[in-house]
Amino acid sequence: MGRRKKMVERVTTLMNDPQRIRNIGIVAHIDHGKTTLSDNLLAGAGMISKELAGRQLFMDSDEEEQARGITIDASNVSMVHTFDNEDYLINLIDTPGHVDFGGDVTRAMRAVDGAVVVVDAVEGTMPQTETVLRQALREHVRPVLFVNKVDRLINELQVDSQEMQVRLGKVIDHVNKLIKNMNPEKFKAGWKVDAAAGTVAFGSALYNWAISVPMMKKTGVSFNDVYEYCKAGDMKTLAEKCPLHEAVLDMVIHFLPNPLVAQQGRVKVIWHGDENSEVGKSMTHAHADGDLAFMVTDISVDPHAGEVATGRLFSGSLTRGMEVYTSGTAKKSRVQQVGIFMGPERLEVDKIPAGNIAAVTGLKDAIVGSTVTTLDGMTPFESIRHVSEPVVTVAVEAKHTKDLPKLIEVLRQVAKEDPTLQITLDEETGEHLMAGMGELHLEVIAHRIERDKNVEITTSKPIVVYRETIKKKTEPIEGKSPNRHNRFYISVEPLDLEIVSAIKEGEITMNMPELERRQKLIELGMDKEQAKGIAGIFNSNIFIDQTKGIQYLNETMELVLDGFEEVMRAGPLTREPVANVKCVLVDAKLHEDAIHRGPAQIIPASRQAIQAGMLMAEDSLLEPYQKVFVQVPQLLMGGATKELQGRRGVILNMTTEGDLAIIEARVPVAEMFGFAGEIRSATEGRAMWSTEFGGFDVVPSSILTEIVGQIRERKGLKKDLPKASDYLSM
């Protein structure tokens, strides 16, 4: 206990010196060794015993993680490392590598300033490596590289010393190619990873050794020595001469920025307020005595303390008892406890200053992405943009009717803890629907509801989430209010895909200055008049007001947008969410008396015009796709390609490496259920495969009617398809 107390004292002292802080994440493709690396870094810093490191999986503290052998949540820990005789505080987040839990990676990247990208020396960069690197660069998080499992190259693939260096060079080149393509400016500004400069380390997390060019100079151990030690199976000597934690954490401290440096570049990317305001300056310079600006990146539940909000403190200091505002709510809350994480344990401290990652209780209105501040009306941080979208849904029911009220509360809670999960109540069927990133994601959540929340549930078979869209433009359609006193003339048309992409990337929002948004839309090819009239953005859909001088329209526009949003949440064809639609209001006639243009009149009028318009514009469906990457011995390649093509898959690329074939394909999510078992049979169990989100595409016309019919039947809608006249005659 003495050692632990001493560690806490060192951590709390260093917290107050931002130059000595490094906030870092460890990111990688699944099974490339992130959690084993994290544990050995903790052992090196004296947090857990060296004997248990790598086998204890301290960071995988959840039962589900240990049972499945994968990281599901992002875990936080603070530790101390000595570099050049100076102590440094390292706040470390270990993130999941499985594509279904990518939301945790995205959120963790908002909290950190640097990332250790882990790549398996044998497998090289994989789809999820690319995804996590993109997430890091998008949040302006600087990467360094750790090439793991070098011992496997030598002992399993039997490569010689020269071939080993060539292969390692290829991994570095590929990572740099990704950085250059994703962020050319940062690449030019010195963010490329370079072994000679010291921003790359090589080693084995399992056997606790690592080498880098600075480490070679320090220890005199060369690449040839590494090769000989591995060949002889003498990992112990290698770990004594070149300890993993020393090589990796020295690299982190030397090359990844402290909060003072990082926030100068990052604040303008993640916050669009006035940089010259007091809070703007305070965030840019990480002032501990400025106004509080804290961004919540994670919500978890402590059985004793209730909800714990973890996040990054950009400005000010957090102390127990202080009163704060949470974005999206007008009332204040009182901070109850402030603390830091040491793996699964949360340790209370008196005060946490800017530049740190903090855990807070008492913020009952906070959700992931909330801005917590002492300023009333502060511009909130930009929302966290997730790379993937929920593509699979299950219906959830309580096994025992008496548990229904508890289930509703539990679903609200899990949605708060995991914002990549979407919970909706299907009002027609009374079912609770849970949409997630994939089958595994939903399985884990369902298991947690039963295990942690003590509610027995039954779930339906997984169902694919579709999107409604349109194929052509319509003339303006008249929507009348039930009392016939108000009329709206709205046309609908497909929204340009470049604009859709910019909305998804967060480059076009309703929060940004109007002139900036207008300019961006004009650059992307939108007509100047339309770009001027943006009234609302909902998911990847836009509502434009092109009217001139209509009396009372300003007072009713909010209700018009409510009607627009209702349709965008559930389209007329299948009640699925709508994507990539532009609605343009070209004219309106409104009753002069406000009593005749209330919500019950205006919302149905705008809603019906859009619903009818979509049906006239060839309403269709988009289905989600996954990119599938399969590694298989060349002799068994035929079985793998046949399996993919039999699922409506398109082979995008095929390459060979040694006796392995690497197949890249794009397959509809609807066809991927049961793939794991089938691909094993087709390849005698020798295929390794992974997936990533592959966007949405139009459902082929040959199966559209069948799929629409299945969705309508499942939702209890009429068998006959709706017609535009059904909405216009209302």
Swiss-Prot record:
GO terms for cellular component: cytosol; ribonucleoprotein complex
UniProt cross-references to Pfam families, sorted A to Z: EFG_C, EFG_III, EFG_IV, GTP_EFTU, GTP_EFTU_D2
Primary location group: cytoplasm
Occurrences of domain tr-type G (ranges): 19-260
Keyword Cytoplasm (UniProt): yes
Localization: Cytoplasm
Keyword presence, Cytoplasm: yes
Binding of GTP, residues: 28-35, 94-98, 148-151
Alphabetized GO MF terms: GTP binding; GTPase activity; translation elongation factor activity
InterPro entries reported in the protein's UniProt record: EFG_II, EFG_III/V, EFG_V-like, EFTu-like_2, G_TR_CS, P-loop_NTPase, Ribosomal_Su5_D2-typ_SF, Ribsml_uS5_D2-typ_fold_subgr
Diphthamide carried by residues: 596
Family named by the database record: Belongs to the TRAFAC class translation factor GTPase superfamily. Classic translation factor GTPase family. EF-G/EF-2 subfamily.
Functional note: Catalyzes the GTP-dependent ribosomal translocation step during translation elongation. During this step, the ribosome changes from the pre-translocational (PRE) to the post-translocational (POST) state as the newly formed A-site-bound peptidyl-tRNA and P-site-bound deacylated tRNA move to the P and E sites, respectively. Catalyzes the coordinated movement of the two tRNA molecules, the mRNA and conformational changes in the ribosome.
Descriptive protein name: Elongation factor 2
Taxonomic lineage of the native organism: Archaea, Methanobacteriati, Methanobacteriota, Stenosarchaea group, Methanomicrobia
